[in-house]
Structures are given as C-alpha cells and as structure tokens.
From Swiss-Prot:
The keyword Hydrolase does not apply. This is Cytotoxin 7. Keywords: Cardiotoxin, Cytolysis, Disulfide bond, Membrane, Secreted, Target cell membrane, Target membrane, Toxin. Expressed by the venom gland.
Length: 60
C-alpha cells in the first residue's frame, strides 16, 4: 500500500501492519490537510479534528 505524504504527489510505501491511508484536517479548514500517511486504525474524530481513512493506494 502506498499513501500520499503531506504534499502530493509525494508518497511513501506503508510498513507492515499499517494498511490504511489517512488524511487529518481541522474541522474549520477541511481543504487544508494537517497530516497524511499510513496508519493501522482510523482515529476517532473530535470536535476540532477529522480523519479520512481508506484502504486503497494513494487515496488520501
């Protein structure tokens, strides 16, 4: 699995066990990702931060 880094088109190959791509962004600024990368479990959203997770190549 390959996930985008913070600035596409750059990407990295995920290590074993991290089989989700994720994008983290502030609720107030959904078009500006704060973090991107590989993760093993999608974190829960909070009042300020949201996560978008997916399990296909470079979908974040």
């Amino acid at each position: 699995l390959k996930c985008h880094k913070l600035v596409p088109p750059f990407w990295k190959t995920c290590p074993e066990g991290k089989n989700l791509c994720y994008k983290m962004y502030m609720v107030a600024t959904p078009m500006l990702p704060v973090k991107r990368g590989c993760i093993n479990v999608c974190p829960k959203d909070s009042a300020l931060v949201k996560y978008m997770c997916c399990n296909t190549n470079k979908c974040n």
